[in-house]
Swiss-Prot record:
This is Toll-like receptor 2. Residues 639-782 form the TIR domain. PANTHER family: TOLL-LIKE RECEPTOR, TOLL-LIKE RECEPTOR 2. Disulfide bonds join C30-C36, C353-C382, C432-C454. GO terms for biological process: apoptotic process; cellular response to bacterial lipopeptide; cellular response to diacyl bacterial lipopeptide; cellular response to lipoteichoic acid; cellular response to triacyl bacterial lipopeptide; cellular response to type II interferon; defense response to Gram-positive bacterium; defense response to virus. The lineage of its organism: Eukaryota, Metazoa, Chordata, Craniata, Vertebrata. Cooperates with LY96 to mediate the innate immune response to bacterial lipoproteins and other microbial cell wall components. Cooperates with TLR1 or TLR6 to mediate the innate immune response to bacterial lipoproteins or lipopeptides. Acts via MYD88 and TRAF6, leading to NF-kappa-B activation, cytokine secretion and the inflammatory response. May also activate immune cells and promote apoptosis in response to the lipid moiety of lipoproteins. Belongs to the Toll-like receptor family. Highly expressed in peripheral blood leukocytes, in particular in monocytes, in bone marrow, lymph node and in spleen. Also detected in lung and in fetal liver. Levels are low in other tissues. Glycosylation of Asn-442 is critical for secretion of the N-terminal ectodomain of TLR2. Ubiquitinated at Lys-754 by PPP1R11, leading to its degradation. Deubiquitinated by USP2. It comes from Homo sapiens.
């Protein structure tokens, strides 16, 4: 029994492992380029079966806890390995021994509490290494990165347990493009630990407290170009001049991101910045100022020197007590050399006039996403304000009048570029006043419905995209670039109004087509972006766009954004791929040809009908059908006459005086139907003929030259022809009153001619002795 249980357990383990392995394989997908993706696939281990074909492997957000020596052994061509956000706590010493081609390694946010230099020794090609978010206290007992001579980006540290930076940690590293250290809970820093790195383009420091900040600053000031401080509380920061003996600084940009600061500590920070002789750019992102802007003027005048700072950027600055904020008059003297200022999304509603006047070197001012209105803007742009200003950005403020905005800015004599997009102007007056040197105006997303003469004619660049424009007819003789996408225009602007235009972006409008003539009218146009419109793919439009090879150089979004909207059977297809049929492209010629062919067919039919009496056949058919539709007064078997006699009026004497006398006076008498005597007056002749034939046992045709020539006889014979012969009966009796040639009988009476050729007919004898026999034969024929 124990043996049986043991076997069952072994089989269960094997089945479980096989299921897990098949699940791992199913969660990994690789393309032909060796890019394998298996992120968020609930993998418990690195899938087996990986070969040298794999070049990139993404196994992030899984449940991998262990990496063995054999997991990646065959991946000799692997260039990128991403294992972030797993549960990795153990990596065997030689796990990466075959990864000499690896360039990108991400082991962030796992459970690696101890780092080993043996992992990284084989990685001679590594340029990116991310070890953030692992619970190690230090960067190992020996230098981890001394063999990584090609390393460019390094990220180390964590928020909770990384407490110590040692001099050996960065030994061997001489140049890095980016170094990020999460030292949020740093408690110990060995001097000159970061000094071993000769050059770092961008250093990012996460530090909750500022205790060790000055020590680190001393080490990096001569090797770092851009220093970024994150998540730091500087409320109690105090600068000690004795802490720094270094004045030869390489730092050109200093960024404070998510930093807390007070009026006093900001003053201390500025004293620190004084030590950076080459500082050109200062940036504050998502910072909190727990103060009211009350900087001590005496200390500022004595200590603070703005140096060479040219660019100041402030984004999303939070001032809890902004309603008590000072006018910054204590900082006026520090602003005279600044050339570029950005204060974005920081609830700015006014720039004091005196401050504006002190910004003598300011060339670029960005006050986007604030609370500026025309009244306060007028105070900010007072006389002698911003004398050097060339670019002013007031995007997404609370401006409402174009006319007032333009008048307010007239004091800025050197202003050439104005961005007032994302304000709600709605309408545009007929005329406006603007600074005389204006070259660029951005009115995108301002809800305007039309453009007027308010637009200055000095413009070289105009952006009116994302509005409600359905017409653009401004004469702008100097305009070189027009951005008018996402409006309601149905055609390209008139080129004669824009003679200098180089760039036109008119995508996502209501344009359905444009022609070669329209494009050629823009003599200077170099770039056109017209995708995203609902194009009618007519033959002319397709011919123009598909045959012009040079058009692809002008249309920068060709061919992906040029889709057909109609005809319906090509909707959604790219214009360059659509092919229309000949009938769609040459409809006029096709219809003309069909009309000509139809005319010739009708003409030919007419000739044939005339030649072969087709009209007669149609008349007979119609007459017969009409007669057949009329109700009969007598049943088809109700015979009233022995014979219906068809004859010419010129032969009436023979019929009435000889034939009638011989037949009707015979005993028993024959009853004959004669049209002169028996037709019902006033009745349609067709009905009389048809009724008489149907009520007669036989039909006697008295043929003569007169019969053939008589219009009446032909008319009578026409309407009796179908009835006589459509059932192939023998009801016809032919009497040849005088010799006539068969050729004299019309061709259309084909059955009559056939009967004369195939059946015996009675011939009126000239000899009186033979006439008695004639009458005997006639009476016998009628009775048969």
């Amino acid at each position: 029994m124990p043996h049986t249980l043991w076997m069952v357990w072994v089989l269960g383990v094997i089945i479980s492992l096989s299921k897990e392995e098949s699940s791992n394989q199913a969660s990994l997908s690789c393309d032909r380029n060796g890019i394998c993706k298996g992120s968020s696939g609930s993998l418990n281990s690195i899938p087996s079966g990986l070969t040298e074909a794999v070049k990139s492997l993404d196994l992030s957000n899984n449940r991998i806890t262990y990496i063995s020596n054999s997991d990646l052994q065959r991946c000799v061509n692997l260039q990128a390995l991403v294992l972030t956000s797993n549960g990795i706590n153990t990596i065997e010493e030689d796990s990466f021994s075959s990864l000499g081609s690896l360039e990108h390694l991400d082991l962030s946010y796992n459970y690696l509490s101890n780092l080993s230099s043996s992992w990284f020794k084989p990685l001679s090609s590594l340029t990116f290494l991310n070890l953030l978010g692992n619970p190690y206290k230090t960067l190992g007992e020996t230098s981890l990165f001394s063999h990584l001579t090609k390393l460019q980006i390094l990220r180390v540290g964590n928020m909770d347990t990384f407490t110590k930076i040692q001099r050996k940690d960065f030994a061997g590293l001489t140049f890095l493009e980016e170094l990020e250290i999460d030292a949020s809970d740093l408690q110990s820093y060995e001097p000159k630990s970061l000094k071993s790195i000769q050059n770092v383009s961008h250093l990012i420091l996460h530090m909750k407290q500022h205790i060790l900040l000055l020590e680190i600053f001393v080490d990096v000031t001569s090797s770092v170009e851009c220093l970024e401080l994150r998540d730091t509380d500087l409320d109690t920061f105090h600068f000690s001049e004795l802490s720094t003996g270094e004045t030869n600084s390489l730092i050109k940009k200093f960024t404070f991101r998510n930093v807390k600061i007070t009026d006093e500590s900001l003053f201390q920070v500025m004293k620190l910045l004084n030590q950076i002789s080459g500082l050109l750019e200062l940036e504050f992102d998502d910072c909190t100022l727990n103060g009211v802007g009350n900087f001590r003027a005496s200390d500022n005048d004595r200590v603070i020197d703005p140096g060479k700072v040219e660019t100041l950027t402030i984004r999303r600055l939070h001032i809890p007590r902004f309603y008590l904020f000072y006018d910054l008059s204590t900082l006026y003297s520090l602003t005279e050399r600044v050339k570029r200022i950005t204060v974005e999304n920081s609830k700015v509603f006014l720039v004091p006039c005196l401050l504006s006047q002190h910004l003598k070197s300011l060339e670029y001012l960005d006050l986007s996403e604030n609370l500026m209105v025309e009244e306060y803007l007028k105070n900010s742009a007072c006389e002698d304000a911003w004398p050097s200003l060339q670019t002013l950005i007031l995007r997404q403020n609370h401006l409402a009048s174009l006319e007032k905005t333009g008048e307010t800015l007239l004091t800025l004599k050197n202003l050439t570029n104005i961005d007032i997009s994302k304000n709600s102007f709605h309408s545009m007056p007929e005329t406006c006043q603007w600074p005389e040197k204006m070259k660029y105006l951005n009115l995108s997303s301002t809800r305007i419905h039309s453009v007027t003469g308010c637009i200055p004619k000095t413009l070289e660049i105009l952006d009116v995209s994302n509005n409600n424009l359905n017409l653009f007819s401004l004469n702008l003789p100097q305009l070189k670039e027009l951005y008018i996408s996402r409006n309601k225009l149905m055609t390209l602007p008139d080129a004669s109004l824009l003679p200098m235009l180089l760039v036109l972006k008119i995508s996502r409008n209501a344009i359905t087509t444009f022609s070669k003539e329209q494009l050629d009218s823009f003599h200077t146009l170099k770039t056109l972006e017209a995708g995203g419109n609902n194009f009618i793919c007519s033959c002319e439009f397709l011919s123009f766009t598909q045959e012009q090879q040079a058009l692809a150089k002008v249309l920068i979004d060709w061919p992906a954004n040029y889709l057909c909207d109609s005809p319906s059977h090509v909707r959604g297809q790219q214009v360059q791929d659509v092919r229309l049929s000949v009938s769609e492209c040459h409809r006029t010629a096709l219809v003309s040809g069909m009309c000509c062919a139809l005319f010739l067919l009708i003409l030919l039919t007419g000739v044939l009908c005339h030649r072969f009496h087709g009209l007669w056949y149609m008349k007979m058919m119609w007459a017969w059908l009409q007669a057949k539709r009329k109700p009969r007064k007598a049943p088809s078997r109700n015979i009233c006459y022995d014979a219906f006699v068809s004859y010419s009026e010129r032969d009436a004497y023979w019929v009435e005086n000889l034939m009638v006398q011989e037949l009707e006076n015979f005993n028993p008498p024959f009853k004959l139907c004669l049209h002169k005597r028996d037709f019902i007056p006033g009745k349609w002749i067709i009905d009389n003929i048809i009724d008489s034939i149907e009520k007669s046992h036989k039909t006697v045709f008295v043929l003569s030259e007169n019969f053939v020539k008589s219009e009446w006889c032909k008319y009578e014979l026409d309407f009796s022809h179908f009835r006589l012969f459509d059932e192939n009966n023998d009801a016809a009796i032919l009497i040849l009153l005088e010799p006539i040639e068969k050729k004299a009988i019309p061709q259309r009476f084909c059955k009559l001619r056939k009967i004369m050729n195939t059946k015996t007919y009675l011939e009126w004898p000239m000899d009186e002795a033979q006439r008695e026999g004639f009458w005997v034969n006639l009476r016998a024929a009628i009775k048969s």
